[in-house]
Amino acid sequence: MAIKGVDISEHNGSVNFSTLKNNGVEFVIIRMGYGSNYTNQDDKRFAENVKKAEAAGMPWGAYLYSYAKNTSMAKSEAEHALRLLKGKTPLYGVWYDVEDPQLSGVDVVATSQTFCDAMEDAGYYAGIYASLSWLNGSLNSSKLDKYDKWVAQWNSSCTYKKAYGIWQYTDKLVIGGKNFDGNWAYKDYPSIIKAMNGETEEEDDEMLTYDQWKDYMERYEQEKAKEKVSSWAKDAVEFVQKEGLMNGDADGSFRPQSNVTRQELAAVLKNEHDK
């Protein structure tokens, strides 16, 4: 199972979600912002893109670009994400984008743990976005194995050896004349996250037991029995009663909307034969 998606930020400008859907895109991961918890570091189109995705019925995830050089900065980045996510439901998870050259030599294992743990503590599904070289290098730690991975490798195949859920395979996916980062997701994230949050899919229809069905049919017949004979059939009903061809129900009534059963037809034919 591979699900087609894109990731977007303010750098993509105004995104037409109908065009995305018409080109087979089924999910989008939206940048929240970058760095520590300052409003001037919010992505200027985050709220707009979330609103558009939800209006289009497209599940979305979110990511924050990291500049954290220590766990204190990572905590601020987590606060940044949580502020922007308040009241929202990212069904494709929350991702920590670790790729900036300034992070060379930083303990990115510790900063990634800090951010992802804060997301999970808040009830979100957390993962790490990074290039193949970062994942095989500075981020290659068993401490991070419990977090999902979103692998950036612009190639014909993903060669990351550990488990991952999303592969960003290109930065040149052209849709509607615009360039996007193209992604394949290999997990049903909406189902996973709904289950994590205790949500279940409700059945549209419930099966009736035999007793429930029987009770329903009896009440249905009772209501139908209250209906009067249609005016166009009144003469015919009076005739068959007078001639003894049909007697109706036990109380002499006729159910105008009911089907004639085989046993009722047999009674009519017998009455005619006996004459």
Placement of each model-derived feature along the sequence:
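Short Gly/Pro-enriched loop/turn and capping motifs at secondary-structure junctions
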Residues: 101-103, 133-136, 155-159, 171-174, ...
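Functionally critical loop-and-helix segments that line ligand-binding/catalytic clefts
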Residues: 1-12, 17-22, 140-207
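Substrate-binding cleft of extracellular glycoside hydrolase catalytic domains
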Residues: 1-116, 120-125
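Aromatic-lined carbohydrate-recognition surfaces of secreted/lumenal glycan-active proteins
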Residues: 123-136
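Short beta-strand/turn micro-motifs composed of small residues
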Residues: 64, 130, 153
